[in-house]
């Protein structure tokens, strides 16, 4: 990691729009992108592939430390996630993997093992780091910190529509319950709870467009970086 490399962190709960916003901001600035949530999901898939149990943290640590993951961007600006040579882009976005990733993220030593890997993404000309503890733990000295949120109902609705477009039949009530449970787990865990970083700009995306969110971030960043 280069200490002088500027970093913009975008934290927030699942479904707030962090991934979409982060990709757009990274594209407009010509910076690198880190999807921290994807790394935890990739680790969750790796744990499944290697048939490891969540009852014991110990064997998960070396897997996290040596996780063979790559991020590739296609011509449409979409991220492709490669685990051990396999394209797991779609697999890691399932609700099952998302729930497992949240549980994996609660292990302190697993988080520590992934910490250096995430920080290694900070290279010139700059990095957009999307996650849940980017501004509080991974890049605490980042000059620009964003906390992006939205109501649980709005986030459930967005997820429902995403899955519906893919032909996946889901119950929106169950989605809402899952989101609320995940919020409670993430906000109350002892290690790296989901909270706004000190000095972060909080943006509620419930009733505003992606373009408006991006513009708010770029204006805030411009004031911090110039």
Curated annotation (Swiss-Prot):
GO terms for cellular component: cytosol. One of its GO terms (biological process) is pyrimidine nucleotide metabolic process. Its main location: cytoplasm. It comes from Colwellia psychrerythraea (strain 34H / ATCC BAA-681) (Vibrio psychroerythus). Its EC number is 2.7.4.25. Gene3D superfamilies: P-loop containing nucleotide triphosphate hydrolases. Belongs to the cytidylate kinase family. Type 1 subfamily. CDD domains: CMPK. It is found in: Cytoplasm. Keywords: ATP-binding, Cytoplasm, Kinase, Nucleotide-binding, Transferase. ATP binds at residues 12-20. NCBIfam families: cmk (TIGR00017). This is Cytidylate kinase. GO terms for molecular function: ATP binding; CMP kinase activity; dCMP kinase activity.
